[in-house]
């Protein structure tokens, strides 16, 4: 039984190893979302620790979540779906599903913690970028930034504050754990 469990675990890593970080970076070269994707990847790695998952696996999902952004910009209902097609067989189905579910316009509802964590990380990255948040930051700075961002993007409050509250996460701590910047 233990051997079967280890084989199953190794199979999961082999699927995830279907694409290396270097290859993912090459796929993203020239993308308007290159730096955003790196930030989302780092946030996902930090979040993985809160949910007892493998940081590199969640980081890869964050890194590749907007791979099709430039291609699907005029057709947001396809955003995420095209990435899932490109990466089919190279990432686990759960990862591809999270990528499809991260944008509400795709029609794929988030159901797993990975789905919801990617939405959180994507929205938190947008908040950090738009509000030019630097680390270390305080809870006050972060909540002021959320308030400012919600004027143009009202969904940020639910996707960031709502998720953090439901999961018992301190947003400012997550931001500070991504490192200086």
Model-based region annotation:
Residues 13, 47, 86, 162-163, ...:
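Residues within well-ordered alpha helices
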Residues 1-5:
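Hydrophobic alpha-helical membrane-insertion segments
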């Amino acid at each position: 039984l233990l051997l079967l469990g280890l084989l199953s675990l190794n199979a999961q890593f082999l699927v995830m190893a279907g694409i290396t970080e270097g290859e993912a970076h090459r796929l993203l070269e020239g993308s308007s979302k290159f730096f955003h994707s790196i930030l989302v990847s780092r946030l996902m790695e930090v979040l993985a620790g809160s949910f007892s998952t493998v940081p590199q696996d969640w980081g890869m999902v964050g890194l590749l979540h907007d791979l099709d952004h430039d291609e699907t910009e005029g057709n947001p209902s396809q955003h995420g779906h095209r990435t899932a097609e490109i990466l089919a067989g190279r990432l686990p189905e759960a990862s591809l599903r999270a990528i499809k579910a991260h944008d509400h316009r795709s029609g794929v509802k988030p159901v797993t913690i990975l789905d919801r964590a990617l939405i959180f990380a994507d929205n938190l990255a947008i908040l950090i970028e738009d509000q030019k948040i630097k680390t270390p930051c305080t809870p006050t700075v972060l909540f002021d930034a959320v308030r400012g961002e919600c004027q143009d993007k009202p969904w940020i409050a639910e996707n960031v504050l709502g998720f953090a509250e439901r999961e018992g996460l301190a947003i400012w701590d997550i931001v500070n754990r991504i490192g200086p910047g």
